[in-house]
Amino acid sequence: MANIQGGQQIGTNQGKGQSAADKLALFLKVFGGEVLTAFARTSVTMPRHMLRSIASGKSAQFPVIGRTKAAYLKPGENLDDKRKDIKHTEKVIHIDGLLTADVLIYDIEDAMNHYDVRAEYTAQLGESLAMAADGAVLAELAGLVNLPDGSNENIEGLGKPTVLTLVKPTTGSLTDPVELGKAIIAQLTIARASLTKNYVPAADRTFYTTPDNYSAILAALMPNAANYQALLDPERGTIRNVMGFEVVEVPHLTAGGAGDTREDAPADQKHAFPATSSTTVKVALDNVVGLFQHRSAVGTVKLKDLALERARRANYQADQIIAKYAMGHGGLRPEAAGAIVLPKGVGVIPDPTGVTLSQKTMTLVEGASRALTGTVQPSDANQSLSWSSSAEDVAVWEAGKVVAKGVGTADITATTSNGLIASCKVIVNAATS
């Protein structure tokens, strides 16, 4: 049979003077668009801080100018005697290097595969770059707040960063989402005033926090949702604005930037979020509730914007697709940055370390029931338990009790939020007449 003639080659660039060697040339632009879309969708800091592009060089300078004061001039006095110089300094942000993410798609695997993986690969490339950029910006924001007293102002008198500690409620606990949300809102009230005292503009203020704390703020506002229609959308569970801050939930709040390896704990991480709080480290992973800022607090310098490159790896019979950018991140204005932290001694809710049941064995007759409760250790851990039965036709757990359904043996198992289990063996005998 003769070879088939014709057939569309949609990916080949067949324009006049163009090379047709690359069969995927026209597909590349779609792929690149998907990377850009994924980056824009995932990044939460890019539209909320200072961005500056440079054509060449290894760094960018941001001038800082201080303030002066006015004074009355009496007859006969000389302005030279009253003049006060306006102080100057600068902040410099250096390019971190070339950040990359790539995939290698082998021809044979691509041919045998029955579903499209490129769309998901593109999303992962874009999201990895976005999370690295976000992590770096947020780590720099935390770094501003942690500046030592000797350097926590660009120029003396311009203002210092603000660190606010949640106040424990007189009744209830910060482990209660509603109480936690109320406490965060109370500190955002103080944060608003702190920035304004530093002459930080009222617009473009942002509060970054974790999904747990974001949900806590929602829980605190929800009972009065009718009165807060301008602040939140109860139907979608989103917050628009609290105390002049755009509230943004960030799952990767404390992840930090990229490193020299692509492991979960990268080597030589360039912008690491502080791990442990101390007398000198006010904000760290173990106590941060959220970071607040004006968009001028942190800056990013772009040498090479997000771009895509595809290379044919003939020796591997594969296509390599690379997403990359060259940027640098750094703090600019300490007076426009701040953080809310947990009180000393109050930390992240610990994971359960064990679970025990009120009974290890139980004997019932058909139709009877008996209480069975579980206790999670430690007491301040997540106390939620999920219950299951190995034989639901014999016995089940319902509303704190084991209910006997039929003759036989069943194991009633309680499982903690992190997968620890405890079981009670239940024997069900026939009911006597």
Curated annotation (Swiss-Prot):
Gene3D superfamilies: 2.60.40.1080. The gene is 10. It comes from the Viruses. Pfam families: Big_2, Gp10A-like. Keywords: Capsid protein, Virion. Its main location: virion. Signal peptide: none annotated. SUPFAM superfamilies: Invasin/intimin cell-adhesion fragments. Interacts with the connector protein and the major capsid protein. It comes from Enterobacteria phage T3 (Bacteriophage T3). It is found in: Virion. HAMAP family: CAPSID_PROTEIN_T7. Belongs to the T7virus minor capsid protein family. Residues 353-419 form the BIG2 domain. The minor capsid protein is produced by a -1 ribosomal frameshift near the C-terminus of the ORF coding for the major capsid protein, producing a protein with a C-terminal extension compared to the major capsid protein. The major capsid protein is produced by conventional translation of the same ORF. One of its GO terms (biological process) is viral translational frameshifting. Assembles with the major capsid protein to form an icosahedral capsid with a T=7 symmetry, about 60 nm in diameter, and consisting of 415 capsid proteins. The major and minor capsid proteins are incorporated into the capsid in about a 90/10 ratio respectively. Once the capsid is formed, encapsidates one single copy of the viral genome. GO terms for cellular component: viral capsid. This is Minor capsid protein.
